[in-house]
Amino acid sequence: MGIKNLNNLLRKKCPDVFIETHLSEYAFKKLAVDVSLFMCKFKAICGDRWLTSFVNLVQCLRRNEIHCVFIYDNGAPNEKSGEREERVKQREKTEQKVIELDMALDKYYMTGEIEPILMDLHDKIEKQSVPVQRLLTKAIQPPKFDIKSVKEKIEKMKNYNIKITPEDFQKTRELFDILQIPYYIAPLEAECMCADLCKRGIVDGVLSEDTDVLAYGSPIFLTKIDTKNDTCVLIKYEEVLESLKLTQEQFLDLCIMCGCDYNKNIPKIGGEKSFNYISKYKSIEEIERNMNIDVTVLNHVRTRELFTNYERHEVKKILYCGSPDFEKVKEFMKDNGINIDIEKLRSSFVHEDLIFVDE
């Protein structure tokens, strides 16, 4: 989930901290990547072709001469259990709805009868896609039932209701071994280890979609990667603090007040109000004291600890990416149904006149 609405707040308060950057700006540098985050993203967008997306990601980074290291989760704090339970309930709810929609879809194809559940979905699609100025006209002249858009929406619901298995993660490890890409298992959460590696100077940045990276204080946060155009959005932690005129401690309290995977925000106090309160009172304790607000839901003392006092991985140095055996790569791609240009992949790994040596 990341920090709730933090991106929106930053876009409003300090849009200049979002810098579109070509990936080549990080050539010869090391980036830490959270496997689970991209696994969820690729499965949701690409379905069964998710492993191909990992190949494309690695290929994109290597053709820009970036050395990536992938980090695996190894559990989560107890404080995250509530958030996990909510996700499970939502997934089960979506699964049941998809089953009912599929049954209604079958009935439509057999009888032409439109069940209410299909019509409700159709109406929601229409409201999302039709300009406001046309709503009155559509109210007078109801649209025809568009079965194609309904079917596409159901398929998207299936894709977003993803399931990830231990075998999926094992398959990525096999891929990274074949491609000679280093990877590690985090002491607990991968996002935490990624940020910590950057804070310790072991890697030069974190590639992620999760704003938790900023709450952990990672100096360099690369996000919104575009593997076709080789670009990303760069956010520098120190520039965020400077633009918001907050200290590290105040910014963390802001993130906690926004809400994250470990807590919920105070009802009716969103990102902007949280920012205004932190700017004025400097800490959650002072907000509670001066505003007479119940901050219990924030669980802020423990949440601060989770973002600052965590177990560190013992690694002191990350290896550079190696040179794959492309005959083995070719065999792996064939065995796993990955349709990719091997020569283009080879050219992404082979760069003239540069040899990286790990001391």
PLM regions and their residue ranges:
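Noncatalytic, basic helical substrate-engagement surface that gates or grips nucleic-acid strands
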Residues: G2-K13, Y26-E189, M193-L197, P219
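Non-catalytic nucleic-acid-binding/docking modules located in mid-to-C-terminal regions
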Residues: K13-L31, V35, C60, N64-H67, ...
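Short, hydrophobic/aromatic alpha-helical segments in well-folded domains
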Residues: L57, M193, I202, G270-K273
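Short, hinge-like loop/turn segments at secondary-structure boundaries
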Residues: E86-K89, I202-D204, T223-T227
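Acidic, metal-binding active-site segment of PIN/NYN-like and related structure-specific nucleases
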Residues: C194-L222
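A polyampholytic, Gly/Pro-enriched intrinsically disordered region
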Residues: D204-T211, K228-T231, L244
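Conserved NTP-donor binding/palm subdomain of two-metal-ion nucleotidyltransferases/polymerases, i.e.
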Residues: V213-Y216, F221, T227-L234, E238
